[in-house]
């Protein structure tokens, strides 16, 4: 299920509305990414986090040493 483990954002029901004003059911799903997060105690955990939480800086992403060396070069 697409649910953010930080803010609790989850899919919401809504309607598609056509030009002729017909309503059909649909789901609005949050943009949830599976990322590796560095926790406060120093451990790394894979979590489902929405992109608005990532952009707001509510979590710290984990970058391995090999990735950080590649980023510097």
UniProtKB/Swiss-Prot annotation:
Gene Ontology terms: cellular component: ribonucleoprotein complex; ribosome
GO biological process terms held by the UniProt record: translation
The name this protein goes by in its record: Large ribosomal subunit protein bL28
Family: Belongs to the bacterial ribosomal protein bL28 family.
Gene behind the chain: rpmB
Biological classification of the source: Bacteria, Thermotogati, Thermotogota, Thermotogae, Thermotogales
Top-level lineage group: Bacteria
Pfam families named in the record: Ribosomal_L28
Disulfide bonds: none
Coiled-coil residue windows: none
Species this chain originates from: Fervidobacterium nodosum (strain ATCC 35602 / DSM 5306 / Rt17-B1)
InterPro entries noted in UniProt: Bacterial_rp_bL28, Ribosomal_bL28, Ribosomal_bL28/bL31-like_sf, Ribosomal_bL28_bact-type, Ribosomal_bL28_sf
SUPFAM superfamilies linked to this entry: L28p-like
GO molecular function terms attached to this record: structural constituent of ribosome
Keywords: Ribonucleoprotein, Ribosomal protein
